[in-house]
Amino acid sequence: MINAQDIKNGTCIRMDGKLYFCIEFLHVKPGKGNTFMRTKLKDVVSGYVLERRFNIGEKLEDVRVERRPYQFLYKEGEDYIFMNQETFDQHPIAHDLINGVDFLLEGAVLDVVSDASTETVLYADMPIKVQMKVTYTEPGMKGDTATNTLKPATVESGATVRVPLFISEGETIEIDTRDGSYVGRVKA
């Protein structure tokens, strides 16, 4: 248990049977009345962000979480099999717990966040940017660079990304895994 005044960014708490990460906090001391903490909490499972006020003396249940590197090995049914890079144990992780799963390649290393007391996986984070080779895209026409037009391109993971017209097959591009958007071309 922690006091509400001890909440900081990244603190994980259990409230109403759900786990929340603090993503923003503010210690408020009004001229009149009691001091309180104004927080923004992100639901670990759904990603829903809510604002919540806590009185300074209020007790909260904190949850200790661990972030460890895991390597993706293969897909088995709906589960993805990962290997803990420290203990070499293999663990299945459900599809919906992996952020940016469309850009997952064999051998990729992800940060897996789990509850330290129960060892249950909360979620797995892809790196924010990944580099992938374009496996298929329509050829661009010469002189089609006047406008900021995008075309679909398939990358090596099988995902489709909208890219500028000058990108051709075989080129390596950088992709933002949060929204699947094109970031730039990677120089060889």
Swiss-Prot record:
The entry's localization annotation reads: Cytoplasm
Question: A Pfam family this protein belongs to?
Answer: EFP_N
Recorded coiled-coil stretches: none
List the cysteine pairs that form cystine: none
The UniProt entry's GO CC annotations, sorted and at most eight, read: cytoplasm
GO MF: translation elongation factor activity
Q: What keywords sit in the KW lines?
A: Cytoplasm, Elongation factor, Protein biosynthesis
Q: In which pathway does it act?
A: Protein biosynthesis; polypeptide chain elongation
GO aspect biological process, one term: peptide biosynthetic process
In terms of superkingdom, the source organism counts as: Bacteria
Q: Which SUPFAM superfamilies match?
A: Nucleic acid-binding proteins, Translation proteins SH3-like domain
List the PANTHER family hit by this protein, alphabetically: ELONGATION FACTOR P, ELONGATION FACTOR P (EF-P) FAMILY PROTEIN
The entry assigns this protein to a family as follows:
Belongs to the elongation factor P family.
Q: Supply the HAMAP family for this chain.
A: EF_P
**Protein task:** Involved in peptide bond synthesis. Stimulates efficient translation and peptide-bond synthesis on native or reconstituted 70S ribosomes in vitro. Probably functions indirectly by altering the affinity of the ribosome for aminoacyl-tRNA, thus increasing their reactivity as acceptors for peptidyl transferase.
Tell me what this protein is called. Elongation factor P
Origin organism of this chain?
Bacteroides thetaiotaomicron (strain ATCC 29148 / DSM 2079 / JCM 5827 / CCUG 10774 / NCTC 10582 / VPI-5482 / E50)
- Record lineage: Bacteria, Pseudomonadati, Bacteroidota, Bacteroidia, Bacteroidales
Q: Per UniProt, what is the name of the gene that codes for the protein in this document? A: efp
